Amino acid sequence: MNGKRPAEPGPARVGKKRKKEVMAEFSDAVTEETLKKQVAEAWSRRTPFSHEVIVMDMDPFLHCVIPNFIQSQDFLEGLQKELMNLDFHEKYNDLYKFQQSDDLKKRREPHISALRKILFEDFRSWLSDISKIDLESTIDMSCAKYEFTDALLCHDDELEGRRIAFILYLVPPWDRSLGGTLDLYSIDEHFQPKQIVKSLIPSWNKLVFFEVSPVSFHQVSEVLSEEKSRLSISGWFHGPSLTRPPNHFEPPIPRSPHIPQDHEILYDWINPTYLDMDYQVQIQEEFEESSEILLKEFLKPEKFMKVCEALEHGDVEWSSRGPPNKRFYEKAEESKLPEILKECMKLFHSEALFLLLSNFTGLKLHFLAPSEEDEMNDKKEAEAADITEEGTSHSPPEPENNQTAISNNSQQSNEQTDPEPEENETKKESSVPTCQGELRRWKTGHYTLIHDHSKAEFALDLILYCGCEGWEPEYGGFTSYIAKGEDEELLTVNPESNSLALVYRDRETLKFVKHINHRSLEQKKTFPNRTGFWDFSFIYYE
């Protein structure tokens, strides 16, 4: 009898359970050959192109939108579920606040793996063909989740090797009122961002990609929804780096020496407590210990009230300060200020205040203030007297620097061994103390950023706050000090009405004002006419 002998019964074969393989297919925008040629031609000629499945625009820089990138809704829902199960980490600094997953480069979830495959194989090949850029196989993608008040401020994405950025949105029904738009900036004659000229609203399954260049300035606007999350996958395709245009350096802000003004101005303006010499000694001891201090109720109440009234109801001319990749706030036109505000500005420029600040801090901001050299000479004279009287001698102590700037320990030690300060000492001895300052208005959306050309030097920062009643730290608007190259904050100064903040910083310390978010509008519930706060911001140099 012909036939196969039945297999002997035995134990079932045990092996690893294989994960179900998932396939993803993308839009006709990528697979249709005629369309591909048209898109490639538009890219090459830098001309707009519009089709129902793909739109390319050149204004303000080359960007492209594919409204329905993945064909299968089931795939997208599976992908969303896997992403929501990832661990997210809060990302927080001067530039952004949102949650980000770990790198998706090696995740094994089926839908994430399938998306990674089509993006960095098939789609990368299509992008290389239409852009004529030799894109590398480098995988660079992660998942971001933006919730209420999260934002990513103005930047250009430029980093060695990044050539094309992409974002795939997986959001619930979304409109402009929810925030979270991808805002694109025009540029000025110096290739710096100028203003938002286009906003792309996230939508489910929309893919946006754009060419990364020295002018690809964009931001993710603050998310205003308290219920909905803005979920997206984003990353970059890498290739040969572009040549950057020469760096643009802003003209330095002029510094001026003190205005001759006698001490009467202090008695007119400042709380008498702070003019008591014994109290000034206490302040200096505390300041030398920590390099910062907050002096509450600094101005006399009647003067402070008049200043606040002029700020709230006076005819102050404000102008916006940018560019937005460095700062966004309003500055008062000093020459057109109401008289009381002019007088307040004069106070901070005055010779008497320079001397008072010297007494508060131990810094030599006035020729009458004792310097470290004076203190050393006094010590030497005392030692010489001891030698004469006792007929003995001993080694003089090492010079001491009583004033330590806000910094971390490792940086302080670098400062002490750096030969550069010696070179500057001669300049310092012959230089005249100077200052620069402005009156600023802070409202929702305002901020300052640390940037590549942020100048770090020894300086005393002074801030006097007005109109901060009811202001909470969660609104933003506080000033943060960080060590250069680090995200960890060394010091945070929160706005507090009629409080004078003094901070001495070194060349390894940078500062920024945190983005003011939409929670700040809650201030209006208590103060209907308020839309933020003001500060007098000055910097003093020895």
Swiss-Prot record:
GO term, biological process aspect, one: cell population proliferation
Stretches assigned to the Fe2OG dioxygenase domain: 134-239
Region annotation Disordered: where it falls in the sequence: 373-435
Subcellular location: Cytoplasm; Nucleus
Keywords, alphabetical: Cytoplasm, Dioxygenase, Iron, Metal-binding, Nucleus, Oxidoreductase, Vitamin C
Binding-site residues, 2-oxoglutarate: 169, 230
EC numbers on record: 1.14.11.-
Catalytic activity: [ribosomal protein uS12]-L-proline + 2-oxoglutarate + O2 = [ribosomal protein uS12]-(3S)-3-hydroxy-L-proline + succinate + CO2
Cofactor binding, note field: Binds 1 Fe(2+) ion per subunit.
InterPro entries (alphabetical): Oxoglu/Fe-dep_dioxygenase_dom, Oxoglutarate/Fe-dep_Oase_C, Pro_4_hyd_alph, TPA1/OFD1_N, uS12_prolyl_hydroxylase
Pfam families: 2OG-FeII_Oxy_4, Ofd1_CTDD
Bias kind Polar residues: ranges: 400-416
Obligatory cofactor(s): Fe(2+); L-ascorbate
Recorded superkingdom: Eukaryota
GO CC term (a single one): nucleus
Role played: Prolyl 3-hydroxylase that catalyzes 3-hydroxylation of 'Pro-62' of small ribosomal subunit uS12 (RPS23), thereby regulating protein translation termination efficiency. Involved in stress granule formation.
Subunit structure of this chain's protein: Monomer.
Entry's family note: Belongs to the TPA1 family.
Protein name from the UniProt record: Prolyl 3-hydroxylase OGFOD1
